[in-house]
Each structure stands twice: as C-alpha cells, then as structure tokens.
C-alpha cells in the first residue's frame, strides 16, 4: 500500500544506539480476561487486526500509574530529515524478557499462532520485538502521518532467532472513559493517482479503547497513518512489533 520511497517514516528505528539502561520492574499482567473470551478481529482485511479487552481496564490503570514513574523524554519538535513530526513523550528500552512476557503471558501468542496464517503475518511468527516503546501524549501532542518500517531483529535464546518485524503492535491504555479525548489512530487507504476520477477512500479511524490491542501491517505494505492530536487528558500506548523468522 505504501508508495515506495514516498512519505515520512516513523523515526523509531534502532538506528541510533541507546545507552543500556536498567529494565523497569514491570508489574504482573493481572487481572486478565481468560484467553477463551478473546478473539482476533480483522477489521480491515489484510491490514488491521484488533483484540478488544486484551488488557482489562484495571490492568491498564495500574500500568499507567507505573509507567508515569518512568523517565520519559519529550521527542524533539524538529524531526530528522525524512522522519514524521512526532510530538509526544516516550520511553524506549530493549527488553527481551518483557517482550516475551507480553507475548506468552497474555492471549497474544495463542491468538496469533493458533491458526497458521503465514500469508497474513508475512511469515512464521516467533514473538515480539524486544524494542519496547512507551508513549504518553498530553493535550496538544500527536504523531503526524507516516509509514512504519520493517526492521531486522535478533531474539535472544540458544540459539538466537534471526527475525524481522512485519506488523506494528499498539496497546492502548487510555480512552475517553479515562478522560483522554482525541488521539485516535487514523489509517489512510491508498489514495488513487491525482488524475483518477475515483473518489479518495475514507480514512479508517480507530477510536481509543483502554485495553484494545491493535496490529497493523508495516514495511512495504504499510498504510499511511497518524496518531491524531490529543485534545484533553493523556493518551498512553505500549508499542512493539510482531516478528517473523528470516
Ligand atoms: O499513537 C498512535 O496512535 C500511533 C503510533 C504510531 O503510529 C507508531 O508508533 O508508529
Ligand atoms: Fe506508526
């Protein structure tokens, strides 16, 4: 979907090595809804999949209060050339243990791997990207239109697994019910060429819902998307990516 070499990138690749920092003492994933009560919903064919109630409202609330204690940094207003304008506060850490927990100690692994869907996921899914990103958007903050890149990663183990990311994972911890207004993630279906008489397709808007997990295809077939401006309250998101064997 993404026209090649056109448009901004997310600017979140591990291009600039981060100094090693102590991994946070992440709280346990409890309470959770039983796996049997959860399902993947393909809300936009081949592009966007959601899991409503992936985390409970209580777990989201506990996480927001825990994450508030982390040293978040405000992203520079002026992005590097080619990167999207992204105004939010974030915390980024390479934490393979947390990524593995988020994968295996929740319904994610079962839901994603129970049906062999190599075509959908872009290969054999082996886990989540250890590069964990926490975003906090306060009033006035947003993430401008961009495409998410696919990256090569190595999942630790004996032996390590060589993998590449194929889908973005966004786990929303806040919503209008928690006082966060705005901040929807909006996807823009492929815009036809200017001269075409076809109408421009409507954007696909994902409203914030605390505990909703959203997966969207990235890399060469990523849809143009943005995080709309937050107009009140705070939007909190946990970001990782699905990884397939390479
Ligand atoms: O915060 C959002 O709604 C979008 C985040 C995003 O697009 C990204 O992490 O690449
Ligand atoms: Fe993105």
Regions found by a protein language model. Give the residues of each.
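Fe(II)/2-oxoglutarate oxygenase catalytic core
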Residues: 1-213, 221-246
């Amino acid at each position: 979907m993404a026209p090649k070499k056109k448009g901004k990138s997310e600017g979140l690749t591990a291009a600039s090595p981060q100094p090693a920092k102590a991994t946070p003492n992440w709280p346990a994933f409890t309470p959770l809804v039983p796996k049997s009560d959860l399902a993947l919903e393909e809300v936009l064919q081949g592009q966007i999949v959601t899991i409503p109630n992936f985390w409970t409202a209580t777990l989201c609330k506990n996480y927001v209060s825990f994450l508030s204690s982390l040293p978040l940094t405000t992203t520079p207003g002026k992005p590097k050339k080619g990167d999207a304008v992204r105004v939010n506060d974030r915390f980024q850490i390479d934490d393979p243990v947390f990524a593995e927990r988020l994968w295996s100690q929740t319904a994610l692994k079962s839901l994603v791997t129970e049906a062999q869907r190599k075509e959908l996921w872009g290969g054999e899914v082996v886990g989540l990207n250890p590069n964990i990103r926490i975003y906090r958007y306060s009033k006035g903050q947003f993430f401008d239109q961009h495409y998410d890149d696919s990256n090569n990663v190595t999942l630790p183990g004996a032996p390590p697994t060589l993998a590449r990311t194929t889908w973005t994972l966004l786990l929303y911890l806040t919503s209008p019910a928690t006082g966060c207004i705005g901040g929807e993630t909006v996807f823009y279906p492929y815009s036809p060429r200017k001269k075409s008489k076809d109408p421009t397709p409507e954007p696909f808007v994902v409203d914030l819902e605390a505990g909703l997990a959203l997966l969207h295809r990235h890399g060469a077939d990523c849809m143009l998307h943005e995080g709309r401006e937050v107009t009140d309250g705070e939007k909190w998101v946990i970001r990782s990516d699905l990884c397939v064997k390479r």
